[in-house]
C-alpha cells in the first residue's frame, strides 16, 4: 500500500491470530506484545508510540466454546489493563481492535440467549467495565450512548448479517483525557469481505 509503513505481529502458529498496523506517520518506536511470556506467542498486540499518544492495536483472545479459555482470558484482561495503565501514566493511549466482548446488552442483538456464550459472559463484560472505570472511554458509546443496532461482527450462520443479528466487539478506546478530542466514531457496517466490518475514529491529536 503506497505511502504507508507496515508493522506485523504474527502468531507462532501459522494461520492463527496476529495483528498489523499500517501508518502514514512514522512512529517514534514500535513494540510487539507487552512483556509477559504467557502472552507472547499469538501476535496479539502492537504498540506504536507517537509524539502525543500511544496507539495499541489488539486482538483479544476468544474464550472459546464451553469457555475453555475463560481463565486465560481473565488473566489476559488483567495484564493488558495493567499495561495500558502503565502507558497512560506517560502519555494518552488509543486502544483499538477486536476486543472480543459485547460490553452492554445494547451492544448485541440477542443478549438473553448469549449470556454464557464467549464474548458476552458476565466475567468478560465486568473486565471491560473495570478497564473503562480505570480512566478510559469507549469512543462510540461516548458519542452515541443510546444507539441501537450498531454492530461490528456477525456470524456467518443463520443469515445473521442480513438480519443485522450482530455484536459490537470492535472498539476504539481512549484515555479519558482525550475524550474532548473525539470528533467522530463510526462503524462502517456496509463494508463487506469479512464477518467483521471496519470501525473508525476521528480524533483531534
Show which residues each predicted segment covers.
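Surface-exposed cleft-lining segments at the edges of enzyme active sites
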Residues: 35-36, 61-77, 112-117
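Surface polyanion/phosphate-binding segment centered on an Asp-His-Pro turn
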Residues: 186-205
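Active-site beta-strand termini and strand-to-loop segments that position acidic
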Residues: 24, 48-51, 175-176, 201-205
Amino acid at each position: 500500500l503506497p505511502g504507508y509503513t507496515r508493522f506485523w505481529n504474527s502468531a507462532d502458529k501459522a494461520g492463527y491470530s496476529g495483528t498489523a498496523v499500517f501508518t502514514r506517520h512514522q512512529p517514534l518506536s514500535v513494540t510487539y506484545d507487552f512483556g509477559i511470556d504467557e502472552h507472547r506467542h499469538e501476535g496479539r498486540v502492537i504498540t506504536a508510540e507517537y509524539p502525543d499518544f500511544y496507539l495499541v492495536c489488539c486482538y483479544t483472545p476468544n474464550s472459546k466454546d464451553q469457555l475453555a479459555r475463560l481463565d486465560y482470558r481473565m488473566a489476559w484482561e488483567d495484564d493488558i489493563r495493567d499495561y495500558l495503565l502503565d502507558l497512560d501514566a506517560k502519555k494518552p493511549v488509543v486502544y483499538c481492535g477486536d476486543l472480543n466482548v459485547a460490553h452492554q446488552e445494547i451492544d448485541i442483538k440477542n443478549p438473553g440467549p448469549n449470556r454464557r456464550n464467549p464474548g458476552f459472559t458476565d466475567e468478560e463484560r465486568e473486565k471491560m467495565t473495570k478497564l473503562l472505570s480505570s480512566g478510559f472511554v469507549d469512543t462510540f458509546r461516548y458519542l452515541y450512548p443510546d444507539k441501537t443496532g450498531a454492530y461490528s461482527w456477525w456470524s456467518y450462520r443463520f443469515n445473521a448479517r442480513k438480519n443485522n443479528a450482530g455484536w459490537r466487539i470492535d472498539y476504539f478506546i481512549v484515555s479519558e483525557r482525550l475524550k474532548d478530542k473525539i470528533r467522530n466514531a463510526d462503524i462502517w457496517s456496509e463494508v463487506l469481505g469479512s464477518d467483521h466490518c471496519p470501525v473508525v475514529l476521528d480524533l483531534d491529536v
